[in-house]
């Protein structure tokens, strides 16, 4: 774990080398502003003042030419390579009400809803805690990057996570789920 210091504030947070600065900060309960978590919106911009990060998507559409000239980065697309000091806006309204956590979930069921849409049910060993409108990020076998899917059920103590997912041609995430790369009984990281 690396220590990420937010310049001008008393806050710092631990961040794993295989996690983005955004997810590390949210897991620590900090109000880091974001919208998409995928590099498209630019809401999670920061300045790297000290240390090094790995930029996972240097040509992300969330950064303007001006941002690139000023060496701004996106917290959702940068992983720490050591301890860092960053300058980033903190928004108390963005403080997570439920802290995001990594967990292994097991695919227990897949059922066809329409010709191109299925419901996938995953189960975790802990309860399923989330708010309406939130989404989960999946690491799927054979897929580069994370895939975001919105939950189709409600928080529950049973640990059930339901997703209604459309089969998108040419999408590796759809392929992994619809073509059986992820089979019932298999665990994936969420």
Regions found by a protein language model. Give the residues of each.
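N-terminal pre-ligand scaffold of iron-sulfur
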Residues: 1-32
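Short acidic, glycine-rich loop/turn motifs
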Residues: 5-8, 48, 140-142
């Amino acid at each position: 774990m690396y220590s990420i210091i937010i310049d001008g504030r008393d806050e710092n947070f631990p961040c794993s080398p295989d996690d983005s600065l955004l997810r590390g900060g949210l897991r620590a309960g900090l109000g880091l502003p974001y919208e998409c978590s995928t590099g498209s919106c630019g809401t999670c911009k920061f300045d790297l003042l000290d240390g090094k990060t790995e930029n996972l998507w240097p040509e992300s559409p969330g950064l303007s030419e001006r941002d690139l000239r000023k060496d701004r980065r996106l917290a959702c697309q940068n992983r720490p390579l050591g301890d860092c000091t960053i300058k980033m806006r903190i928004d108390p309204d963005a403080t997570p009400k439920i802290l995001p956590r990594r967990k292994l979930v097991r695919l227990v069921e897949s059922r066809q809803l329409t010709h191109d849409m299925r419901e996938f049910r995953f189960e975790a060993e802990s309860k399923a805690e989330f708010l309406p409108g939130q989404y989960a990020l999946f690491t799927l076998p054979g897929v580069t990057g994370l895939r975001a899917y919105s939950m189709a059920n409600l928080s529950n103590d049973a640990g059930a996570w339901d997703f209604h997912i459309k089969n998108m041609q040419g999408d590796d995430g759809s392929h992994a789920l619809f073509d059986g790369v992820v089979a019932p009984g298999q665990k994936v990281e969420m």
